[in-house]
Structure formats: structure tokens, C-alpha cells
Design a protein with these regions (language model features):
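Surface-exposed strand-loop-strand hairpins of Gram-negative outer-membrane beta-barrel proteins
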Residues: 90-115, 126-137
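Outer-membrane pore/translocation modules
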Residues: 71, 76, 146-251
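Transmembrane beta-barrel strands of outer-membrane/channel proteins
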Residues: 82-90, 120, 129-133, 149, ...
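Repeated loop/turn-to-beta-strand initiation elements of outer-membrane beta-barrel proteins
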Residues: 124-130, 153-157, 199-202, 271, ...
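Residue-level signature of outer-membrane beta-barrel architecture
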Residues: 120-122, 131, 149-151, 195-197, ...
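Cleavable N-terminal export/targeting peptides
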Residues: 1-73
């Protein structure tokens, strides 16, 4: 599939892939309403609120978590965390190679997205409301959704990106060309799930949701699965500028399996430094390419990998107040004897918060 893509690049187009960060999903944070009472004659029927049932289940899981208290502690309070965050995301794409005797080199990127958000986390589940000034002003028209769950044993990252801002330079034997924003539409879904083996002493939530506090340094091996899929399609703007450019649709999907390692380094009693990497080897490919309405056979790459990296710095002023920054990166490498393709998606975040 990507060999066909390079052919297309040399004509005037190319694609980018993946991913990155920000919102959590949870039940709406309502007050702890106890029960609704309904009178029917002499009968009193008590209807327990849905939120209380959910809250009780979350509380049982949160307060009864089996962390080693010498390494990980639960802050005092009800398990509610509020944060103010600034987020920025970006996506770059690089490709070079020779296909059918035609050499090309491509450097593309989507527009950076900067948002400000207010986030709430309740006993491990959270939600965030983000504001994007550039989108309000009409400068940024891309769409991006990020869902994250960080648990004691299992964690999950999901991101979806729809971008029309892909732009950059294409160099090759046929001359240098420019892909302008709006000439192609990229849609990409990324999903990463991973299991933490040393889940009693190593805490992802301590680094990324701050719902726990790492007291002593600890690391853990990780087992993970990743999925990357989506499509790239040329737009009418490209045809208007280059009437001879082909109409191309590329659909792709990759599933990878792998393992990695994460480490939480505690400095003093207030600083936490986190680093982790989870490489996965692609074990399944589903690629499809349509050129001017005709299906083309997609070729497999000989070496496919998807890397997932995370960094975090957290400073706990006390059990209640904290601040920090995180960086999440997703990198893809696709390689055969003629073509090398590399994609990098990243999300940076700075935050300050309080625990209740």
C-alpha cells in the first residue's frame, strides 16, 4: 500500500498518519444525591439514583485498590481531582524512496492544535472540556478526539484525527512540488491497550491522572496491543490546482503486538519523573488503494512497527495541590527495500490541579 502511496507522492500528494491526547469520559459529576422517595398509597418506594450506584462501584474499586502502600498511596479525600491544562498536539510525516525508477522525498505536517481545558477526575474516571481559540476564529478546521484511561492493571489510549491541514514539500526526480493545506483529507484512528505487570508498586495514574501518589521509585514490564487505521483522500482543491493529478483514496489498517517497560522515579518526597516505551510489531495489515475509481493491489511492507512513548514530570506541593507536564508520542515505521515511511504524532500538556 505504501509503495503505491510513494508513487502518488511523486505526482503531487502524500499522506500522514496518526495520533494523540486529551479528553477523558466519565459519568457526569453530580452531587451525591441519596435516593428519590416516591409515595404510592401506604407504600414508600425508594429509588436509588444511578449516580450513587456508579459512585459506590467506583469507590469500592478506588478505595480498595491493592497497591503496595509503601510504594503508592491514595491521597486523602473523596477521590475527586480538578485540573487546568494547556495542550498542544502535532503530526508530521516523512517518506523517501525509489519506486518504478522514480525517487521522491516528502516532509509533511498538519497544523498544530493548542487548547485550554478544565478536567475533572473522580475515583479514576474523568472528563474534560477544552477550548480551542484557533477553531473559534476559523483558523483551525481539523477535528481531533482523544480518550484515555489509566488504571492499576489496564490502560487505554484512543485518538481520532480528521485533518485537511496536511501540507509540506515533495522533492523528487520530477521536480519539487508543494502540497497545500486543503488538498487532501486524512482520517486516522489509533488505539493502544496495555497491561502493567508490577501493578502493586508501579502506578500509571500517579503520573498521568494524579489520582494516586508514587512514594518510592518502581518500574514495570508492559504488554500491549495497538491498532492504527484510517484513510487518505485527495480533494477537489488539488484537482483545481493540478488538473492532471489522480484522484486517490487509500484505506489502511494495522494491528501490532509487543511489550515494553515503564519507570516512575521519585526524587525526594515531591518530584515524580516518568518514562515508558511500548513498541509493537505489526502482525496484520489491511490495505486498499483506489486510483481514479480503479482498485489497485496493495503491497505489504517487510518491516512495520508502531512505537508508543510517554514522559511525565509531576510536582506534589502537598497531598492536595500539584503541577506538572506530560508528553505522549506515537511513531510509526514502515520499511521495505525501496521505501521508508515515518510518522510522528505527539501531544504535550502542562497542568496545575487540586485534589478533594
Amino acid at each position: 500500500m505504501f509503495r503505491r502511496l510513494i508513487i502518488f507522492i511523486s505526482a503531487i500528494m502524500v499522506e500522514s498518519v496518526t495520533v494523540g491526547a486529551d479528553t477523558y469520559v466519565c459519568p457526569q459529576l453530580l452531587s451525591d444525591s441519596v435516593a428519590q422517595t416516591v409515595a404510592t398509597g401506604d407504600t414508600i418506594i425508594q429509588k436509588e439514583s444511578l449516580w450513587k450506584r456508579v459512585s459506590d462501584k467506583l469507590g469500592a474499586r478506588y478505595f480498595n485498590s491493592k497497591y503496595d502502600s509503601a510504594y503508592v498511596m491514595r491521597p486523602e479525600g473523596k477521590g475527586l481531582t480538578l485540573k487546568v491544562r494547556m495542550n498542544q498536539t502535532g503530526n508530521t510525516f516523512h517518506a523517501k524512496g525509489t519506486v518504478n525508477g522514480i525517487y521522491s522525498k516528502t516532509d509533511l505536517s498538519t497544523s498544530h492544535k493548542t487548547t485550554f481545558s478544565l478536567a475533572a477526575s473522580y475515583r479514576g474516571i474523568g472528563a474534560a472540556i477544552a477550548i480551542n481559540p484557533a477553531k473559534w476564529s476559523g483558523v483551525y478546521k481539523d477535528y481531533e478526539l482523544n480518550l484515555n484511561y489509566y488504571g492499576r492493571r489496564f490502560s487505554l489510549d484512543l485518538s481520532y484525527q480528521r485533518s485537511e491541514s496536511l501540507s509540506g514539500d515533495i522533492y523528487g526526480d520530477r521536480g519539487d512540488k508543494r502540497l497545500e493545506s486543503g488538498e487532501a483529507t486524512l482520517k486516522v484512528l489509533n488505539l493502544v491497550g496495555y497491561y502493567t505487570f508490577n501493578h502493586r508498586r508501579f502506578s500509571y495514574p500517579a503520573a498521568f491522572t494524579q489520582s494516586y501518589i508514587q512514594r518510592r521509585s518502581a518500574g514495570s514490564w508492559l504488554l500491549g496491543i495497538s491498532y492504527q487505521g484510517g484513510s487518505i483522500k485527495t480533494n477537489d482543491e488539488l484537482k483545481q490546482r493540478s488538473p492532471d493529478a489522480p484522484e486517490i483514496t487509500i484505506e489502511f489498517g494495522h494491528i501490532g503486538l509487543g511489550g515494553g517497560y515503564g519507570y516512575n522515579l521519585v526524587l525526594g518526597s515531591k518530584w515524580l519523573l516518568h518514562a515508558s516505551i511500548l513498541p509493537t510489531v505489526v502482525v496484520y495489515n489491511r490495505n486498499k488503494m483506489i486510483v481514479n475509481g480503479e482498485n489497485k493491489e496493495a503491497q505489504r511492507m517487510r518491516f512495520n512497527m508502531i512505537f508508543n512513548e510517554r514522559l511525565a514530570v509531576v510536582y506534589n506541593f502537598s497531598q492536595r495541590f500539584f503541577a506538572g507536564a506530560t508528553l505522549v508520542m506515537n511513531n510509526s515505521v514502515f520499511d521495505d527495500k525501496n521505501v521508508v515511511i515515518n510518522q510522528n504524532k505527539w501531544r504535550a500538556r502542562a497542568f496545575i490541579g487540586v485534589r478533594f
